[in-house]
């Protein structure tokens, strides 16, 4: 189990809670976003600080644009009085649901929010803008740079230097000028190291287009995340012949792919409590153990002949069970009436008729970006599912029990960031586009206010979804260019732990199936005596009662070093299965 918050300053965590409460009561006040962003940066979460700063910038920009869709305004009533009024109002309703203000309900769909009197708010003024805009740019640039998103940090430096600041904002100009020089110098130095000693200083020119776009965020269970399940919970039946149980796995964080060079025995002995699939009875070779379909799917092909729900191919014209088109959408088709009804119940209800969503993340030209945008589309589908089902996205059954390869929170994460060296937990890919801008756009296209929706769709929720999807989503490659084009999250498939000697094979279509491997399909490794012993122990069965059902996340034909490198992203460290340990000992 990952430690939660005992390595973070409890006073700062408390300040973060209070700042968030104030923000949720005053969502269109850019000063509230700025205040919380500073706390996030102090806590060692520059990714969250960057998002707060960008939201503050967006709202402050509306002060200069009277036509802005999201005008900046601030609550007149002090927080204490407002909270007291809300409490009195809730106590006066005998049938009020105690969970109505909990994070399980989307603020974006809460009609009570829209009924708030305009007399409780006043416009953010031009004076407010001049007083704070410099601090906004300072926080935004510093946070993006700490994450490693250098191109966006540079762009906002240039943008910020074009503005006129008030008395407070004058302090921002020297910082932005210094940041530009640091970014330029770092770029030139990196290129010089790559080019070798024969290149002269003047031969390398700064090119903003060559700056790094993708950085990293900490991949942790946030201290305020109350949605992670108890991984020591009772056994759960999920199919006729298998069930979910807890299992102690070796902790892989901190080990290198070439694990034989790891000299610290404690790294190999540390245990991580996870969930796994186990056989409830003996299973014969070739037996299908599990059929699992999922509505948590995504495709990056625009106008493709795939079912919008399950991503299976649409039936041929004239088939006995024809495809079904949504009457309220321009180009949303389902493979069957059953899929259409299930989609409406699980996700389509929240996005039906919202045509602006159709092009987001589709037909991406750069092959390197295709997988990243598929993960974005999975986040968008999770948003739609949560909004349709009126639950928090992290409480969706398809999401809740997935392990996100979370790391332990470091003792002093801020010290690592301050030294421009990301802490060990900063392994989650993070970019301004995919973690900040596009999720806000998705909420807008869904008809939600991205500021009023923070209780349910804040950036820490987005990051947690990304952490759960990366390494667990299954996919299919395009027959056109070989890049990923379809992916899906099958939570039970994800629960089956990895081994380089798996006892099941899996097939991906509109659903995933687990089939028990026969002897000819089992990986042959170890001495002939050991192989024969393992075969005899199985006693003619593929999987014996109480044995763990083991999946695989990499090409089993690779050598141990290559397998470990391939599966590092999904496992969080080098594989320590019996086969890998034995092959490592032989090499």
Cite the ranges covered by each PLM segment.
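Short alpha-helical interaction motifs and adjacent low-complexity tails used for partner binding
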Residues: 1-587
């Amino acid at each position: 189990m990952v430690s939660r918050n005992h390595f973070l300053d409890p006073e700062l965590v408390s300040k973060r809670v209070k700042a968030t409460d104030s923000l949720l009561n005053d969502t269109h006040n850019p000063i509230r976003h700025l205040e919380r962003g500073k706390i996030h940066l102090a806590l060692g979460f520059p990714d969250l600080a960057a998002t707060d700063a960008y939201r503050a910038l967006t709202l402050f920009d509306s002060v200069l644009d009277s036509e802005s869709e999201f005008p900046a305004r601030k609550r007149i009533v002090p927080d204490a009085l407002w909270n007291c009024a809300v409490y009195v109002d809730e106590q006066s309703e005998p049938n009020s649901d105690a969970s109505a203000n909990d994070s399980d309900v989307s603020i974006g769909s809460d009609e009570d929010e829209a009924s708030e009197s305009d007399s409780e708010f006043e416009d953010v003024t031009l004076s407010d803008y001049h007083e704070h805009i410099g601090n906004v740019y300072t926080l935004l640039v510093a946070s993006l740079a700490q994450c490693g998103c250098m191109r966006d940090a540079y762009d906002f430096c240039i943008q910020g230097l074009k503005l006129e600041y008030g008395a407070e904002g004058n302090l921002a100009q020297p910082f932005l000028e210094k940041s530009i020089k640091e970014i330029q110098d770092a770029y030139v130095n990196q290129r010089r190291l790559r080019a070798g000693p024969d290149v002269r200083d003047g031969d390398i020119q700064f090119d903003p287009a060559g700056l790094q776009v993708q950085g990293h965020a900490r991949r942790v269970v946030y201290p305020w995340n109350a949605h992670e399940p108890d991984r020591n919970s009772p056994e759960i039946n999920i199919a006729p012949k298998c069930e979910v149980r807890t299992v102690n796995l070796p902790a892989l964080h901190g080990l290198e792919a070439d694990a034989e060079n790891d000299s610290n025995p404690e790294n190999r002995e540390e245990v991580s409590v996870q969930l796994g699939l186990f056989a409830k009875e003996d299973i014969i070779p070739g037996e299908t153990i599990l059929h699992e379909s999922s509505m948590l799917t995504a495709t990056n092909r625009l106008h493709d002949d795939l079912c919008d729900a399950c991503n299976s191919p649409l039936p041929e014209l004239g088939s006995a069970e024809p495809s079904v088109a949504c009457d309220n959408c321009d180009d949303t088709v389902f493979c069957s009436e059953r899929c259409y009804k299930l989609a409406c119940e699980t996700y389509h209800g929240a996005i039906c008729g919202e045509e602006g969503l159709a092009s987001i993340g589709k037909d991406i030209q750069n092959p390197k970006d295709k997988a990243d945008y598929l993960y974005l589309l999975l986040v968008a589908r999770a948003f739609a599912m949560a909004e349709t089902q009126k639950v928090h996205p992290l409480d969706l059954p398809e999401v809740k029990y997935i392990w996100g390869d979370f790391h332990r929170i470091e003792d002093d994460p801020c010290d690592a960031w301050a030294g421009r060296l990301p802490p060990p937990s900063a392994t989650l890919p993070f970019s301004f586009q995919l973690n900040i801008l596009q999720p806000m756009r998705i909420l807008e296209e869904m008809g939600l206010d991205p500021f009023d929706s923070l209780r349910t769709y804040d950036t820490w929720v987005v990051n947690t979804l990304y952490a759960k999807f990366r390494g667990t989503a299954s996919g299919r490659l395009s027959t056109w260019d070989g890049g990923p084009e379809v992916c899906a999250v099958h939570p039970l498939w994800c629960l089956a732990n990895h081994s380089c000697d798996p006892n099941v094979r899996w097939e991906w279509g509109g659903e995933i199936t687990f089939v028990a491997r026969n002897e000819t399909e089992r990986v042959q490794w170890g001495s002939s005596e050991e192989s024969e012993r393992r075969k005899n122990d199985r006693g003619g069965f593929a999987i014996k009662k109480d044995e763990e059902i083991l999946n695989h996340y990499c090409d089993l034909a690779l050598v141990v070093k290559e397998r470990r490198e391939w599966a590092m992203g999904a496992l969080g460290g080098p594989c320590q299965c019996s086969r890998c340990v034995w092959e490592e000992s032989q090499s």
